[in-house]
Amino acid sequence: MRSTARVDSGIDYSTLPAREVSGAAPETVGGVVIGGDYQGLGIARSLGRHGIPVCVVDDEASVAQASRFVQTVVRVRDLRTEASLLSALAQTRDRLHCARWVLYPTRDENVAALAANREALLSDFRVPVPGMAAISQAWDKRETYRLAARLSIPIPRTWFPATEADLASVDSDGPFVIKPAIKEHFFYATGVKAWRADTRAELAAVFRRAAGIVRSGEVIIQELIPGGGGEQYAYCAFFRRGQAVASMTVRRRRQHPSDFGRASTYVETVSVGELAAPSIRFLQAIGYYGLIELEYKRDPRDGRYKLLDVNARTWGYHTLGRSAGVDFPYLLFRDQVGAPVEEVHARPGVRWIRLATDVPNAVRDIRAGTLRPGDYLRSLRGVDTEAVFSFRDPLPSCYEIALLPYLAFKRGLLPAEMRGNRCLKLRIPLASSTISASRTPCSRERP
């Protein structure tokens, strides 16, 4: 049944590819990857394997800079704000002549900035991101959960208290999850995605802490769904014209940290047909275009899959798709340059791991008694894809090893007690911007 809760994204899907490719030949077009961590590295490899030139724009040391598939690296001081991102893209366009290339954001705040400035950016780049009306439904979890409720998509019990007095309306004794409506307003201050409270007294204390960090009205309280990684699932897709042209369903068996993971560390493709219909219903309602991941958790109390999060960009383990038969970044590129894209769906039973976070997380879980060593070792058998290591492109994995001390401070790979001092930072000093183009300069597109 057609949903009536549609949000107009401002995109005419019948003309999107033609509009995006006007005035350019596909062979002259490359990809601009915004963020060069393992997620961005996967995008670069996806495009580079097909001979597509790649430029990485980043504000920190990252593994993609060492990839043989990256022709150009643009280092800037900051990418977190809308102004800094637009400035970085302008520098990339003017100094490297990469106009009309396809943009690949890897961070939520960059997706929001591209959506807010989409029309202005279309004259210089291909922007495979819908307008802000659609993106806000994914970026702001208040909008995500309200829309899901209108569409009868299961979600955890959720409350939106504006003040501490509103906690009286929370008719549950816990345990609770306290999270921000907009992740970036909380994550960069705390290094975590959410906090847990087991009692109502803890809930009040944690709410006060969260309310002191995020803007008024941005604190969300949810019931904590029981169960570990075996209950974490996701539906991933390239969505176009109201349909999933490509899709992949996964179980996110392990994540870092184990309680409220910032990123998955061990993922396998599975066949769970129940996730497709609610996901497609949600994406149709917001008029979505592009790559997308919808995170769910199966509630063992009632067997329902409940929507937790929507990520309107490539996700950390997107390279699992290529091993399972779906090369998501390349499919998006083909669509952006007007090439045909055939419907494809990932095969089940394919596994992905990121050793840099999975191993230390497993050690902590083994010490805590929540994971048995034998079970962990058996899970490593038959892994098909590692997030960074590749025989065809080995340098990034060497670079990652060298970066581990930096990542331990920057990305929170250290135990929590060692990360408590937020003043402890490891920074690599930069000029305002640095451009490295020692391999092959970006091709200049001719109109």
Predicted regions: what is each one?
Residues 56-70:
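Short, glycine/polar-rich helix-capping loops at beta-to-alpha or helix-loop-helix junctions
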